[in-house]
Amino acid sequence: MSVASQDVVLADLTVVIPVRNAARLLPECLASVSREGPSQIVVVDGNSIDGTLDIARQYPTIILSDGGRGLPVARMLGVQAAKTRYVALIDADVVLPEGSLARLLDEFTAGGYAALQAGLHSVGGPGYWGRALAQHHRSGRSKNWFGVVATIFERETLLTVGFDHKFVSGEDIELRWRLAQGGRRIGVSTRTIVTHRFDGDSFSFARDQFAMDGRGLAAMVRKHGWRGARLLALPAAAAVRGVLLSLARLQPQWLPYYVCFAVGNYLAMIDTLAGRPRKAES
C-alpha cells in the first residue's frame, strides 16, 4: 500500500482506547497510536486516579468517561463517538510498531473481515510471574484466539452486535461467540504483530489475570448454557499442555505457574457460577 493510500484509509479509522489507572502504560501506547495518524483517538476513562487523564491530554485525543462502568461500556462509548467507517479497539497495554495500523486495516479490508485482531507478542517484567505470563501467552494456543486487545471492526458491526454490558470480564470471548454464530468472518493476523505488555510482575497480578479469565468463561456458561459448557475445560487443557511443553523443553520452572493458572481459573469459575460477589477492584 502506498503512503498516499495509507493516509486515505487511515482517515476513515478511529482508535478507541479504554483506560483505568493506566499511567504506566498509556504514554508509550498513545505515542505509537498518534504516530500512525488515525482520524480520531478516543480515550475512554474509567475514573482513573493516577494521572492517566493528564497523559491523555498531552495528545490529540477526545476524552470521555464511562463512570467506572467497565470495559464493555467504555468501548461502546468510544465506538458511538467515532465518526469514521472503521474503528480500532486498542488496549492501553499495546504498543503499535510503525505502519502496523495501516497494514492491519489493509488486511482487514482485503480479506472481507468483520473483525481482525493483530497478532500479539507478549512481554512481561523481569520477575518470575511477569516472565511466566509472557511465555504462556507467547507459547499457548490462546495467542491465535480472536480478542479485542488490538482489533479493527466496521463501526456498524459493533453498533449492531456490541458488547454485553453484563460481562465484567470475558466480554471479548462472548463477542467472538456471537460474531461467529452470525456467520461473520473474524480472525487474528499473522502478518501484523503488535507488542502486548503485562503491567505487573507479582503473584497477586497473575492471580488477578487468572481470576478474570475464569470469571469470563463462567459468565459464558451462565449466559449460553450447555453450548458454552465446553469452555470450562479450557484452563485444564491449557495447563496440561503447558506442563507437558515445560517438561519437554526442560523448563520445569514454569510448572508452579501452570498449577496456579488452573487453580486460579477454577476458583473464579466456581465463585461466578455460585453467584458469589467478587471483591471490589482498587
In which residue ranges do the predicted regions lie?
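Short aromatic/hydrophobic "clamp" motif used to bind/position activated sugar donors
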Residues: 87
